[in-house]
Amino acid sequence: MKLKKLVWLTAFALSAGAMAQSAPLTIPHPTTFDQLNHPVAEVQMPESYVKAIAQQAYIWGYPMVNQFNRRATITQAPEPALNGGMVPVAPMGQLSMLTDYIKPAETFVTCPNQDVVYGLGFFELDKEPVVIQVPDFGDRFWVYAVYDARTDQIANLGKPYGSKPGFYLLVGPNWQGETPKGIEGVIRSSTEMANVIPRVQMDDTKEDRLAVQAPVREVMTYPLSQFDGKMKSYDYANIPSIGEKPNPSAGETKWVIPNKFFDQLDNVLNKVSPLPGEEALYAHFRHLVNAGKQDPKVRQWMDEAAEQTDKTVIADFFKWKNNGVPAGNGWNRSKNNAEFGVDYFNRTGTSKSNMFDNKPNETQYFYTDNDATGVQLDGKHDYTVTFPKGQLPPVKGFWSLTLYNSKHLFSPNELNRYSLGTKNKDLKFNPDGSLTLYVSHKSPGKEKINNWLPAPEGTISLYIRAYWGEQAILDGSWVPPKIEKVK
């Protein structure tokens, strides 16, 4: 009897063992994001966790919320116009152009430049493709920077690429229509949100101001339904001024409002698809946003984290040492600009400090708040910036040195001068072939006035742009000159 019982128990054990081994010994490894478990909606997240994820979301989403808010504002214009008499605005699908350098009182974007004639237009490509019209610019440097919602450029369109005059079609990620006859090429955006900023070189002379007007009139965008294969033009010299003039002392228009951020991030998560590898971030951020909708206390913690992050992490990006990488002599240089990918540090830093950069091969940026000894630049001191002979920025296009006030904007001065460079045909070189530029609040004297950048009182920063740089610009082997305090 005992033997039979033992046999039965052994058989049962073996049977149970066989059943246990019917499942794979190794659990299959997930190979796609959909095979992973996602955050659980019902969990009760503590304040510390909510704020940690909220801070990450604020840093990550800042550039895209910035973009969508700019689009919402700019496209309220009923026709191409100048907001406050100085910033191009236009209805959705169209652009507006300046006909001269941007006015110094503008606050739409930090670090404006007075090297080019700007334009601006925003698009909603899930509604209809847009035709981008390119006139014949001759030998003049030009580039149309076309950005997606992430502020990455999505087109190679300009003089550096040998782009032809004509018509280009900008389409959304899901567009499957037919390309009309007469279109030079198709630009596919990665997001429905896109914008274009044409930049057209103009020398600081009466003659070139006149010469640039003809091509500028033909810089246009319009819905595909209006395309007829004929070059159109627009009289930008006589467009109306709408809206109130900005207050430069207040700094750049605040495009990201912390206590509205998470409402707007919800739209971003729905409108902008994840980049490869971003799926987990989207899952975490959606989980957070949904929790904030369900629980007012969670939303309060999210808003508190947004406010704090804006005052600390985001504010720190306004210091040039926290942008890009060291370039020598106290300068930093931009890195991955306008092709950020998952470089969130530089993407968010640029969005805060100098939105809408060009790609490095189009423009390389060098910037600093400090002199050669590491001391903060201040308008109460006089400085010299000397380029040794043969060491001007090596470019195929042109270069400039621009001065900004503490808000990364222009401050009015007696010469109405905010930058010096290739555009200035009256710069005076030293007998040894070097070029010295003077940065000071007071004039350095009549003989040096052509090389003078007037500085406001208070802290300042300097900014070099190298358009269409040579290899030494691209690989970082060219080093910006020292900024030396005059004793």
Region spans (language model):
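Gram-negative bacterial Sec-dependent N-terminal signal peptides
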Residues: 1-22
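A compositional/structural signature for long, glycine/proline-rich flexible linkers
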Residues: 21-487
